[in-house]
């Protein structure tokens, strides 16, 4: 065939339909690599989450690789400790303790994790770049990429930044199917990224 490999977003909270897509690809001899497996990477907001040597990155990696149709995981790593952490996840089966940790995390971030579905963004009368702003805030808060995030935010045309969100009715909140406080998060992101 024409394609030998593709990459898709996949995590343990959303994208349930991805498994079927990956399976259909595998049946046609197409390999799948996945990324964004950590579902927002917000574990530092939940200090009791990672116990007994378990880590969210390792559990999420094992979860993704437990799907026989997933060939590889793409993960951002910025130091050797992270490389060791991810390598420690490979070749080991996903255990019950990890499944339980992933479920606790999923429950904790359900209304905090942006799935980038775009529904809230389309409800915004000011055309604020909600998905981009959420992504840059995530990079700032959870990936240690403060300078990059601020640069990226500064590249958004001013009228699409969150500078007006404080005076808004919050159509984005009402539109979010996951109950996120989108407006509040955008205001916080604006303060953080300017």
Give the ranges of each region predicted by the language model.
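Flanking helices and flexible, charged tails adjoining ferredoxin-like Fe-S electron-transfer domains
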Residues: 143-194
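Beta/alpha (TIM)-barrel catalytic core signal, keyed to glycine-rich beta->alpha loops juxtaposed to Asp/Glu
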Residues: 1-119, 123-128, 132-135, 142-157, ...
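Residues that form generic nucleotide/phosphate-binding pockets
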Residues: 105, 136, 188, 192
């Amino acid at each position: 065939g024409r394609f030998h490999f593709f990459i898709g977003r996949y995590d343990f909270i959303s994208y349930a339909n991805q498994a079927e897509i990956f399976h259909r690809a595998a049946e046609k001899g197409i390999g799948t690599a996945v990324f964004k497996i950590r579902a927002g990477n917000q574990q530092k907001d939940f200090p009791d989450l990672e116990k007994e040597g378990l880590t969210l990155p390792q559990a999420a990696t094992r979860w993704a690789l437990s799907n026989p149709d997933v060939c590889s995981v793409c993960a951002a790593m910025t130091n050797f400790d992270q490389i060791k952490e991810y390598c420690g996840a490979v070749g080991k089966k996903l255990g019950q303790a990890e499944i339980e940790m992933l479920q606790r995390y999923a429950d904790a971030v359900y209304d905090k994790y942006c799935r980038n579905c775009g529904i809230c963004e389309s409800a915004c009368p000011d055309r604020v770049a909600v998905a981009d702003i959420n992504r840059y805030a995530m990079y700032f808060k959870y990936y240690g990429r403060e300078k990059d995030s601020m640069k990226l935010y500064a590249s958004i045309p001013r009228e699409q930044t969150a500078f007006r969100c404080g005076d808004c009715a919050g159509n984005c909140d009402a539109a979010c199917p996951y109950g996120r406080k989108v407006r509040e998060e955008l205001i916080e992101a604006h303060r953080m990224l300017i």
